From Swiss-Prot:
Record: active site: 656, 681
Pfam family membership, one: Amidase
Name of the gene: Arp1
Family affiliation: Belongs to the scytalone dehydratase family.
GO molecular function term, any single one: lyase activity
Highest taxon, organism lineage: Eukaryota
Keyword Glycosyltransferase included in the entry's annotation: no
PANTHER family in alphabetical order: AMIDASE 1
Subunit structure: Homotrimer. Each subunit contains an active site, located in the central part of the hydrophobic core of the monomer, which functions independently.
Its EC number(s): 4.2.1.-
Function: Scytalone dehydratase-like protein; part of the Pks2 gene cluster that mediates the formation of infectious structures (appressoria), enabling these fungi to kill insects faster. The product of the Pks2 gene cluster is different from the one of Pks1 and has still not been identified.
Protein name from the UniProt record: Scytalone dehydratase-like protein Arp1
Length: 744
């Protein structure tokens, strides 16, 4: 075989082995840019379609599908008028070709439902339901493809535009509209989706911070080297899957400051350019680390929600400076698997939103049964309203804040109380804190936790993996995370344990003395604490800043992250401020933070306990002078432990610490855990948990029994043996002593 023949053979072989896969098509209809999904929604007719239209492009024509039969010929025009109002994807140009489910109801097959548009109506011939709305019809196959409207990300909030695939994975939405150094985002028609009890987020468009893994998507964490080093994710994390399962449509990945550390534009943002804050003169700091999330919600009406994370203020900061809703929930409400950590001890996922009703529905979808919602019953509102470090009355935003406080106090039927956290600490601080002030106790706590945790969990494996494929080189890292990691390296390993101890000291003090949880499930929080996180002043991005330093100090915004309490931002209004950039008066938002007690449901979650119980439990209390049950039913066990005489007592707070442990494998379906325990208890004079009546601690060993039931491991009983007690342990539970002694 000659050289030319060999070349031709190899070229042919290479061609035969290649594949051509469609990734969608971009079209323009009446001056509006669209993306035609590569995935068919189904056939509206069998075979090709002969349609006389001037709109045919690449075999696609715009079409409207009407799937239901709840219409008449006379109501179609009002239906289309309503569609123009509720949907930004559909437009009258889609009316040239209409497919209707109940074709026989129409007597006129050619009609003008909109001025200037002549409609041809065809029967909808399908065996499965195609949602109503705008589509692009492939005239050769009779298949309709969903229409996505394309928008320019002019605020620079996104890193990737995504398309959800039918198999649950994601791929890049391959389209670009005319723009200057910004990407294009595609959104599907809202008409395709119907909200139901099972799908309360159906059709809700969401952007996701670039630290959450999505199946089929490469994650960057704000670092170019990271993005190019690691492959696409194989699975979607629990938090994002919760939203998808409830109907959410994820349209793109959004910018984060690098590795979710706090960065200031513009110098700190080296690998990627910081998103733009649309408020004021348009050149203000968007705050971080959920910068893309905040910027997008403040900039785009076509986006409904953005998912961010809050470790030290990464949601609340962007919400504050851009005048939108944002929340840091109680810590630990949802798993953060497949999420890049700053510190698991502090990380929480939350939302940035414009619509409080949608915000509420999203919270319920994300946090599931750990989210308390009073939509179906009347709550009892707390009567304590604390004001923390409110601005002086002569500041521009003070009147707006005071107006809100006045209305809230009236609604709660209470009076606000100014609180000095430092004085309260000095008056009631635990003895183990010594003479330290809050500022002294917590000065390095945040810096120590995030620098030590992230260096171990993120930097070390990242550096190792990068070096393995780049001849031992180090990847580039922005100045802020690098400065924090470097400082952490210079500190002793004991710094982290000291920081965790100090955080716990503050958490126990705050949750016991300032905002204890309420025993009333219709109240949850004993009070509300209001503080102001922003001053309605310009913080421009066109300024030179000093080199980064570790985040030392303690501020009111850190209360919730150390106490693990919810802290939500509410926009209230705006104030005029003169801009030297525009040489004009612009407006900046005014917001307020509302802190509540750590979720009551997290203190005693009986539903979660019931779910892990075996049908029958072996309960042996003979070693502590009580009875033994060889086969106590799960319901009886729940009734016993949740009784007011036992763990259900709202005046008792308990904490169990596990020490040494070993496991005994009895069989394939039974295991015994041998645990060393310290059970600490405090009894309060009332359910507000303000005043301690007595303490009682028990040191014990405990056998916990576990059995496999229907393939799932369940808790099947316990056998405690007390070694010694401290204080008045015998008087902790009301069921442990005589009626005459009860809480006298």
């Amino acid at each position: 075989m000659g050289w030319n023949q060999t070349f031709l053979f190899l070229a042919f072989a290479a061609t035969a082995a290649s594949s051509l896969v469609g990734s969608g098509t971009s079209l323009q209809l009446n001056g509006i840019d669209y993306f035609v999904s590569p995935f068919s929604q189904g056939k509206v007719t069998n075979g090709s379609v002969a349609i006389n239209t001037r709109q045919n492009q690449l075999g696609f024509v715009p079409a409207t599908v009407i799937a239901g039969d709840l219409y008449t010929e006379s109501t179609l025009q009002s239906l289309f008028l309503n569609w123009s109002t509720v949907d930004d994807v559909w437009q009258p140009a889609f009316l040239e070709t209409i497919f209707v489910f109940n074709f026989a109801k129409l007597t006129n097959k050619n009609h003008n439902y909109h001025d200037g548009v002549s409609s041809s109506v065809f029967p909808l011939q399908v065996t499965h339901k195609i949602p109503s709305g705008p589509y692009f019809l492939n005239v050769h196959t009779g298949e309709v493809h969903p229409a996505y409207r394309l928008y320019d990300d002019f605020a620079g909030a996104f890193t990737q535009s995504l398309l959800q695939r039918p198999d649950g994975r994601f791929q890049t939405l391959s389209a670009q509209v005319p723009a200057a150094a910004s990407i294009t985002i595609g959104v599907p028609s809202r008409l395709y989706f119907t909200k139901t009890e099972a799908k309360p987020l159906a059709g809700v468009r969401i952007g996701v911070k670039d630290i959450f893994s999505l199946a089929g998507v490469k994650k960057g964490c704000g670092n170019r080297a990271w993005y190019h080093l690691y492959p696409v994710a194989n699975s979607t994390g629990t938090a994002m899957q919760n939203l998808i399962d409830k109907g959410a449509i994820i349209v793109g990945v959004q910018k984060t400051s690098q590795f979710a550390n706090g960065e200031t534009p513009t110098a700190d943002w080296v690998d990627y350019h910081s998103p733009f804050n649309p408020r004021g003169d348009g050149y203000q700091d968007p705050a971080t680390s959920s910068a893309g999330a905040g910027s997008s919600i403040a900039s785009y009406e076509w986006l409904d929600l953005a998912v961010g994370s809050d470790t030290g203020g990464s949601i609340r900061g962007p919400a504050t400076v851009q005048g939108i809703f944002g929340n840091r929930p109680s810590h630990g409400l949802v798993s953060l698997d497949n999420v890049m950590p700053l510190s698991p001890k502090l990380d929480t996922p939350g939302f940035l939103a414009r619509d409080p009703c949608l915000w509420n529905a999203a919270n319920a979808a994300l946090y599931r049964d750990k989210y308390t919602f009073f939509g179906h019953q009347a709550p009892r509102y707390p009567k304590k309203l604390y004001l923390l470090d409110f601005p002086a009355g002569n500041t521009s935003h003070a009147p707006i804040l005071q107006n809100f406080v006045t209305k809230l106090a009236k609604f709660l039927d209470t009076s606000p109380t100014n609180i000095d956290l430092n004085k309260e600490w000095e008056r009631t601080r635990p003895t183990s804190a010594g003479d330290q002030s809050l500022a002294q106790l917590l000065n390095t706590t945040y810096a120590a936790i995030i620098s030590k945790d992230q260096a171990k969990l993120v930097r070390e494996p990242f550096y190792r993996d990068y070096a393995a494929v780049h001849d031992g080189r180090l990847p580039f890292v922005n100045p802020v995370p690098l400065a924090r990691w470097t400082w952490g390296d210079s500190q002793p390993s004991s710094l982290l344990s000291d920081a965790v101890r100090n955080k716990t000291l503050f958490m126990d003090w705050f949750n016991g003395n300032i905002l204890p949880p309420s025993s009333d499930p219709l109240t949850c929080s004993s009070g509300l604490l209001l503080h102001v996180n922003g001053s309605a002043d310009f913080v421009s991005r066109n300024r030179y800043i000093n080199p980064p330093v570790p985040p030392f100090g303690f501020s009111n915004s850190q209360i919730s992250l150390f106490a693990e309490t919810p802290d939500s931002v509410f926009p209230l209004g705006q104030v005029p401020v003169f801009s030297s950039i525009t040489n004009n008066t612009e407006y900046l938002p005014v917001t307020i933070d509302v802190v509540a007690a750590k979720g009551f449901q997290l203190q005693r979650d009986w539903a979660r306990l019931r779910a892990i119980l075996a049908p029958a439990l072996y309960v042996d209390y003979t070693k502590i002078g009580k009875e033994k049950w060889d086969a106590m039913s799960a319901d009886d066990f729940m009734a016993m432990v949740s009784n007011d005489d036992f763990l259900g007592d709202p005046c008792v707070k308990t904490q169990h610490l596990i020490g040494a442990t070993y496991w005994e494998r009895v069989s394939e379906s039974k295991v015994i855990g041998h645990h060393q325990l310290r059970a600490a208890h405090q009894v309060y004079t009332s359910p507000d948990l303000k005043t301690v009546k007595l303490r009682g601690h028990s040191h014990a060993t405990n056998e916990h029994y576990y059995v496999k039931s229907n393939g799932v491991w369940k808790f099947a009983g316990l056998k405690p043996e007390v070694r010694w007690n401290e204080y008045k342990f015998e008087e902790v539970f009301k069921g442990s002593y005589t009626q005459s002694e009860k809480h006298s």
